[in-house]
Amino acid sequence: MAERANLVFHNKEIDGTGMKRLISRLIDHFGMGYTSHILDQLKTLGFHQATTTSISLGIEDLLTIPSKGWLVQDAEQQSFLLEKHYYYGAIHAVEKLRQSVEIWYATSEYLKQEMNSNFRITDPSNPVYLMSFSGARGNASQVHQLVGMRGLMADPQGQMIDLPIQSNLREGLSLTEYIISCYGARKGVVDTAVRTADAGYLTRRLVEVVQHIIVRRRDCGTIRGISVSPQNGMTEKLFVQTLIGRVLADDIYIGSRCIAARNQDIGIGLVNRFITAFRAQPFLAQPIYIRTPFTCRSTSWICQLCYGRSPTHSDLVELGEAVGIIAGQSIGEPGTQLTLRTFHTGGVFTGGTADLVRSPSNGKIQFTENLVHPTRTRHGQPAFLCYIDLHVTIQSQDILYSVNIPSKSLILVQNDQYVKSEQVIAEIRAGTPTLHFKERVQKHIYSESDGEMHWSTDVYHAPEYQYGNLRRLPKTSHLWILSVSRCRSSIASFSLHKDQDQMNTYGKKDREIFDYSTLVRIMPNGHWNLIYPSIFKENSDLLAKKRRNRFVIPLQYHQEQEKELISCLGISIEIPFMGVLHRNTIFAYFDDPRYRKDKKGSGIVKFRYRTLEEEYRTREEDSEDEYETLEEEYRTREDEYEYETLEDEYGSPENEYGNPENEYRTLEKDSEDEYGSPESKYGTLEEDSEDDYGSPGESSEDKYGTLEEDLEEESEDEYESPEEDSIFKKEGLIEHRGTKEFSLKYQKEVDRFFFILQELHILPRSSSLKVLDNSIIGVDTQLTKNTRSRLGGLVRVKRKKSHTELKIFSGDIHFPEEADKVLGGCLIPPERQKKDSKESKKSKNWVYVQRKKIIKSKEKYFVSIRPAVAYEMDEGRNLATLFPQDLLQEEDNLQLRLVNFISHENSKLTQRIYHTNSQFVRTCLVVNWEQEKKEKAGASLVEVRANDLIRDFLRIELIKCTISYTRKRYDRTSAGPIPHNRLDHTNLNSFYSKAKIESLSQHQEAIGTLLNRNKEYQSLMILSASNCSQIGLFKNPKHPNTIKELNRRIPIREIFGPLGVIVPSISNFSSSYYLLTHNKILLKKYLFLDNLKQTFQVLQGLKYSLIDENKRISNFDSNIMLDPFLLNCHFVHHDSWEETSAIIHLGQLICENVCLFKSHIKKSGQIFIINMDSFVIRAAKPYLATTGATVNGHYGEILYKGDRLVTFIYEKSRSSDITQGLPKVEQIFEARSIDSLSPNLERRIEDWNERIPRILGIPWGFLIGAELTIAQSRISLVNKIQKVYRSQGVQIHNRHIEIIIRQVTSKVRVSEDGMSNVFSPGELIGLLRAERAGRALDESIYYRAILLGITRASLNTQSFISEASFQETARVLAKAALRGRIDWLKGLKENVVLGGIIPVGTGFQKFVHRSPQDKNLYFEIQKQNLFASEMRDFLFLHTELVSSDSDITNNFYETLEPPFTPIYTS
């Protein structure tokens, strides 16, 4: 009884770790047998209690946490603030994602802690609580998802979804939450399935490598060891784990007293003595050397002492134990059980999450300010850092609370601040951050609204995308999207589009656009003028397209004023990009309505051209040769080319009309083989001008569509890709490179051309045809279910791989009596119809005769007789009939010529689109001048205002040289910053460059075309630079005082330089090289709505200024419509202006909430109008972008909602859950290179191999080099693998991993340097075998260390039977047979395969005879020590040589004491 009274009575709950401790103490105290008896009683007790308690589980037992409501509210408020900061442009997208994930993760974790205390206080016998927290079933995180909140989920890529699931499973999820939840859950299910297979295969490979490793001897006699010391940043726990169960490699002294001898195994008692010794004298304690499998000298087995204690009991491992297989299974097995942390997968946390300290109640907080230092949190918010533990008091109404805050925490509140209950007052940094594998991730940011892009810093052009639109930001700055309202209409009297912009006015299908013709133009005298109501007629689809290097401006003509002219000419003027015209450039064209195709549809155009010298043949010469020549001229080239459209005839019209941009999909090809260059003969403009593209005028007034055509080889191969030609496709529109110039040399004249109707349908393979091949049909016959023929005639069907072609040839067929006499492919005029033909009726039209062959009977020919429409070319059209003649006075040196072009190539099929007309002939105006004059002309648009009328002129003038307004362009190839990505200062808007003004006055002669805005003037007129007076932004001799007066009236403006002028009533002539202005902020000179007149006085007339990118001020018409509601007026009072030192200037970008003039700016934006008492801000959205981010797009480019703006590259920590963890372990074992092995191990080994022999400079160099290399890589590999497992909380003893790593690194490759008689170069041999062979032969063998993966190691063992049973059986056996290999059956697997006794087990010793090697042990040790001392002297002399790789040389001295001392780190 007395004994029992002295026993300690423990009265507390016991959990898993407590149970572990109890069992290990029982084993130490009583041994294995008795312990198992005690544990049996425990088990019985447990089952008895569980049965009597009879725990049941109901949904009522899931208690929700009361504090959840305000916690979630708190987190939502933080998220809202975050969103707001993002909106202001204070943080960037990646930062927002990180913080939001952190906020919700912290909330979720705090809820989890609350849950534990909640259960403990309210219902300690709750079955859910009992089950999960006793470790019986379930864990805290599962219960947390049931009663707390589900928290953050990861998507399948492992990226965090920043919308948290706030509900728990007890409350039920909303639809969105359910979908997000499925993401994470599905990932979990897939991972579980995948990891089982992965882990199983990993185990198999590991066991394969080490199955032959057995404990065969007591001691191998090594004197080497690995040093372990707690000073090297190793935690105490890790230190204990590493030491227990090992054997000492050297005696250990404290002072002069030896406390442990060599070859003694280390138990818990010894470890505790070490730790106390280290604590007492941390600096004097020497590292402890232990034996490991690495240091064992045996090749294919291991000795007792190098292995240490058995994992099962506290004694040395027994001889005959198969430790290799145990090791393989110990590593592979946890892989199947590693916990899956689904909700942590986002891995956005770089450290552990911080613990938050919350205020216990409302009250005033106080702490000693001297103990804290101001700093910032990792999110940039101000905070205080306390270096020592801080005592904080909170004074509520009647109670004084005190809170202790540990050192190195951040205080998030001010002293004497009033805090609310549960407010976060401090943040405790988590301990050592867990291991995270970093990876670089790209995040794309997309624009949230339409707008124009600006940035507030210089950018680099990324050199690899020299001509692309990607830029790199050299420093953190804002990108701005300036608001633009969605309407892209052609309200402007003529449209000048920026590069690549598309303008639509919507056709009848688009009803959502209201009628813009109600918008009126503000005229100075106040009368209203409707702009182009004609655009809004039904069924007008207009698409103006700015091509790569020219502008298109339609000239509108009004019918009632043009009786003597051709009605409804749509003249389109094209101005090249830089405004420079070369000789013989076409700068305007229009379409003559007489050469328009009628609505009959598609067909073939035929003509013959004659050179200018050729004499015109009259039609009366009806000789037989005439027919011969005709036949040759007009022979169809059917074998070479036919036509087919990309138009899907069977598509629904909805698709076509839905989006006007898709309607015109034309693919042309210049058949260069036939015609040389596109400009060679008769200069077809078809390739270049894309017909109706880009001539808005003709489309809106003359309703006809484009020609669609495509070449198709008749031969079986598919049509060629358009890449071969110089046409390229962009955004559904075709552009063509090259300028439209042609030379007179090749020009042919055409006297007449013919149009022969023909129809082509491209049908899908699947469609069933209602007509037969070679049959004759009438008009409007049904061809397929929803296609009808437009022509009557002969049907030809041809089936291709992807589609079916159906051609209809108009006309009748005729069977001649004698097949030979029929001529194929000739045209017959109306007078000479064949009398003997069976056609009795006489035709007034020309007839085209085509010879066909019926496929079925080879002899029978027939002739297809097809009507042809003849068009005569009109030679008489000239400038006089085009324009009123009296206004045109041609100068000597600039001429305009009129040229007609046929828009189609000879014998080509042209396809009709829907119910539209198409044009055959296009008339062009060509500008030309004498050869010896200057080589270039400049074109510009001029606006002249006089007497309330606005007139626009196209001015063409000769230019001396381009230097006057283009400086040297920036060199695009250099990667230096381009200032604001601008082209260059002077060439953007040369109206403001002095040089250009001089060049204007030098050339008085110029042709100007009037682009009429007012019905009174439609004409071409001459305008010379001297006729106009410029009043504007530079001092003019005629009005020297203009600007000064204005500046006197508005004193503020002097700060900002000239901000535009209010125009005197006489005239304002401003010639702006529109073509050169690349980026400008633009404003409509329209009054938007009547009732806004008062508010937006500022928008009226010309009382405002606009700026372009280069801070130049200008007044322009534009295509960007600014919505008045996007503009905010800020009134600036003089007094407030003087008080605040804020200086604003045009174009300044201001973030929301910036304090200017005593009031906050309510919206972010750009100042772009400054008045006397106010300024106008154009709404804009800032996006913060960090250094190195890539910007997509150009400065001033218009982006639409959803376009990609910026790409961030940021590092995120890879989550170390199983999906990333197991593969990492596997990669290391397989010796594949992975990013997070900081320097690649393979490379590190190479370096060592090269360096060490050079440093040591002795014949043993290779041996030492290889050994040091192998030692170094082994240590680093073990650490890497342990990190992955420890991060998952899995404990694996180091020696299991060491046994496997030893096999992976035990081979060296014989190098070619020294040819040895024993091994062939490139052969893999064991390191020890190489050493022994070297000693035996007395010559050095050259080899280098290599790292084999576990698979390769399994295929490089000494037993070919083991290899063959693993992989590649046939290959391994064949090789072994050819080489005559012998298998000594040393391992387990070989014996199992052959059915022998396996050489393991405790009876093993009887088979083993003592080897004579043991007797020589002492002598060897002596020799080793001799070598060690020599090495030490050598290294002492050359310390600085070795210090290049610090990792190892720190310990180099000890390395050779007991030779190996690399260090384990946690």
From Swiss-Prot:
Give the matching InterPro entries: DNA-dir_RpoC2_beta_pp, RNA_pol_beta''_euk, RNA_pol_Rpb1_3_sf, RNA_pol_Rpb1_4, RNA_pol_Rpb1_5, Rpb1_funnel_sf
Q: Report the EC number(s), separated by commas if there are several.
A: 2.7.7.6
Q: Does the keyword Cell division apply?
A: no
Q: What's the catalysed reaction?
A: RNA(n) + a ribonucleoside 5'-triphosphate = RNA(n+1) + diphosphate
Q: Which Pfam families did the record assign?
A: RNA_pol_Rpb1_4, RNA_pol_Rpb1_5
The residues the record assigns to binding Zn(2+) are 220, 296, 303, 306
| Residue numbers spanned by region Disordered | 615-725
Write out the annotated subcellular location.
Plastid, Chloroplast
Disulfide pairs? none
Q: What is its main location?
A: plastid
- Among its keywords, does the record have Transcription? yes
Q: What's in the GO CC field? A: chloroplast; DNA-directed RNA polymerase complex; mitochondrion
**Could you tell me which NCBIfam families the record lists for this protein?**
rpoC2_cyan
Query: Quaternary arrangement and interactors, per the entry?
Result: In plastids the minimal PEP RNA polymerase catalytic core is composed of four subunits: alpha, beta, beta', and beta''. When a (nuclear-encoded) sigma factor is associated with the core the holoenzyme is formed, which can initiate transcription.
What family is this protein classified in?
Belongs to the RNA polymerase beta' chain family. RpoC2 subfamily.
Its biological purpose is as follows: DNA-dependent RNA polymerase catalyzes the transcription of DNA into RNA using the four ribonucleoside triphosphates as substrates.
Official protein name in the record: DNA-directed RNA polymerase subunit beta''
Organism whose genome encodes this protein: Lolium perenne
